[in-house]
Amino acid sequence: TNAMYMISSSKLKKSKKMLSDTEPYFFTLQSEMSRILRHIPDISSIYFKTNEDKDAADKKVGYIVITADKGLAGSYNHNVLKIAQEQLEKNPNHSLFVLGELGRHYFEQRGIEIEKQFHYTVQNPTLNRARNISEEIIELYRKGELDEVYIIYTSMINAIQEETQIEQLLPLKKADFNIQIPVDFKREELALKPSP
């Protein structure tokens, strides 16, 4: 058990480092989106379109479910799968995208159709894999085959506390970008390419 503890603490440290390495990019991207929306609040884009005219039962909802590849993670996988199952039952007009062996086995055993299985090991995420996954999902959204896209995953708050999250990825909500107007807003320059 001491060896298992050392291995798990090593994996936790590695995961924390990977998270801290990607957070600056994520927060900078959010900041830039906020900046763009400050200057062009009425921007129209397919990525902000909400399809409010469509009845909720007619909306095609995509769910990206992220689980582990192995089952030695306590409630980590159980809670994600439980919430995913609830969402799928609530929205029968859905498409399911699964990352992780446990998720694949769970849905296959229950006869739930998986739109796309991404056969990447979730223990070793890469930018290239993330790009491949996002390109496929975005293409379905752009074609109108998906009206909304959600991601269901477990967020590690600290070493002993985790929380299952469900977040809407598409369409983007302008309110999600904290659009605070800085003091020097009038002097702030913005160059967009291609221009809107």
Model-based region annotation:
Residues 1-196:
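C-terminal beta-strand-loop-alpha-helix "lid" module of Rossmann-like NAD(P)-dependent dehydrogenases
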